[in-house]
């Protein structure tokens, strides 16, 4: 005969199988989100990156990077762009982007207020209305900032 108490003491695997199923569902959900989720940042964030990237390229006098963040209509000639940048640095110091606000996106065009300051007058903030366009799949600055 079997002892009735021995069957009651035997552990069951149901809680472990249930926990394993929940963990598997969570892992599957994470994988699906990573595969099908949107990796591209919002357009407003891309506009801000374009403003900062263009300014950084100018400060480093890197015309190739400047072109990456500038629309074709505003790219100009390398010698002229870099000469204006050197002149601006000599007069006002390096230019820094403090903020990009009031971003408004309308299809492949956008506007934003970009706030700058210069090294020689760090407390004098200059807010400039800038325009941006989406060219070749990327947002690019399509107006000139203060120099």
What positions do the PLM features span?
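Short, well-ordered alpha-helical segments enriched in acidic and aromatic residues
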Residues: 50, 57-77
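Surface-exposed, charged secondary-structure patches
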Residues: 3-4, 41-42, 83-129, 145-147
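Short, low-complexity N-terminal intrinsically disordered segments enriched in polar/charged residues
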Residues: 2-59
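Alpha-helical membrane-embedding segments
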Residues: 36, 73-86
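Sequence contexts marking disulfide-bonded cysteines in secreted/extracellular proteins
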Residues: 70-72, 141-145
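A broad structural signal for short, well-ordered beta-strand segments within beta-sheet-rich domains
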Residues: 47, 95-97, 141
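A short, surface-exposed beta-strand/turn
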Residues: 125-139
């Amino acid at each position: 005969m079997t002892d009735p108490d021995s069957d009651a003491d035997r552990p069951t695997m149901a809680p472990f199988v249930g926990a394993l199923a929940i963990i598997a569902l969570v892992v599957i959900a994470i994988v699906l989100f990573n595969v099908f989720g949107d990796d591209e940042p919002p357009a407003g964030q891309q506009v801000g990156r374009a403003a900062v990237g263009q300014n950084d390229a100018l400060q480093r006098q890197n015309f190739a990077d400047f072109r990456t963040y500038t629309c074709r209509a505003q790219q100009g000639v390398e010698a002229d762009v870099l000469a204006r940048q050197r002149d601006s640095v000599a007069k006002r110091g390096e230019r820094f982007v403090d903020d990009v606000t009031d971003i408004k996106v309308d299809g492949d065009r956008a506007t934003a207020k970009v706030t700058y300051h210069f090294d020689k007058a760090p407390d004098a903030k200059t807010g400039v209305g800038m325009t941006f366009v989406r060219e070749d799949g990327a947002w690019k600055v399509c107006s000139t900032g203060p120099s």
